[in-house]
């Protein structure tokens, strides 16, 4: 799942949201793996750079290639959206209720007051929620946790009885998704409906957050602030995905 920071008039953009979604074979859970944008990685054809630069250099194909090289796992599908997509899909389901680990004030990038705990947000407010990072304790890392919390909230609302039993809301959400999501050619409408139906028994506690492993913060040779990749940790993450045992990985991981 790629969220681009493109705004009107932009020719190139970096990806501010990079979440790898893993659904186990038994469809019992949904794992959301956040890849921090400042991970210092090798980008094919471009040398060392921040992970989100791969999207600016070569779009989704190069981002996928960079991530596959990082964890050693093939990525099956790509879904892209932008800020307008976040807003439109949130409004289509009537807003979302999301948990914030930290409060943030209206003076920050968000422009709204977010309290620590549960917040009910409309589309514009949700967009502010996922963009804020300057007031958060770990900057982009904390923002990534907010983004995963939002994705979870939107997913749970979209498959809730309030939406799936309401023909009007279903139509509104489908229309918003169709207009604001770009998917790879293998993700047909029938495929997406089938996957959504297969996840009908998933509840909030079944949506699990994981942050891709890094050893800490540092500086690149050209003076950029970076997240230092935990190479053994990335290999362990890739093995867990490939072997469909992310539950075991999560229980032993030192990064929440």
Located regions from the model:
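Non-catalytic, solvent-exposed segments at the cell envelope interface
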Residues: 1-256
């Amino acid at each position: 799942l790629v969220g681009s920071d493109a705004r009107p008039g932009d020719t190139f953009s970096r990806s501010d949201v990079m979440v790898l979604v893993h659904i186990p074979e038994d469809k019992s859970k949904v794992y959301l793996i956040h890849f921090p944008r400042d991970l210092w990685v090798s980008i094919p054809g471009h040398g060392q750079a921040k992970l989100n630069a791969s999207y600016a250099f070569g779009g989704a194909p190069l981002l996928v290639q960079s991530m596959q090289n990082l964890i050693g796992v093939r990525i099956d599908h790509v879904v892209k959206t932008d800020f307008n997509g976040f807003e439109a899909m949130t409004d289509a389901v009537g807003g979302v209720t999301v948990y914030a680990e930290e409060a943030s004030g209206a003076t920050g990038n968000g422009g709204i007051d977010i309290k620590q705990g549960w917040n009910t947000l409309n589309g514009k407010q949700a967009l502010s929620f996922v963009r804020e990072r300057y007031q958060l304790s770990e900057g982009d890392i904390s923002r990534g946790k907010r983004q995963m919390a939002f994705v979870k909230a939107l997913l749970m609302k979209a498959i809730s009885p309030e939406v799936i039993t309401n023909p009007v809301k279903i139509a509104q959400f489908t229309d918003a998704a169709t207009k604001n999501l770009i998917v790879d050619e293998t993700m047909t409408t029938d495929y997406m409906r089938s996957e959504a139906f297969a996840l009908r028994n998933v509840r909030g506690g079944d949506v699990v957050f994981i942050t891709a492993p890094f050893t800490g913060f540092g500086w690149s040779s050209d003076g950029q602030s970076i997240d230092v990749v935990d190479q053994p940790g990335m290999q362990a993450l890739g093995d867990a995905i490939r072997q469909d045992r992310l539950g075991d990985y999560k229980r032993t991981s030192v990064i929440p």
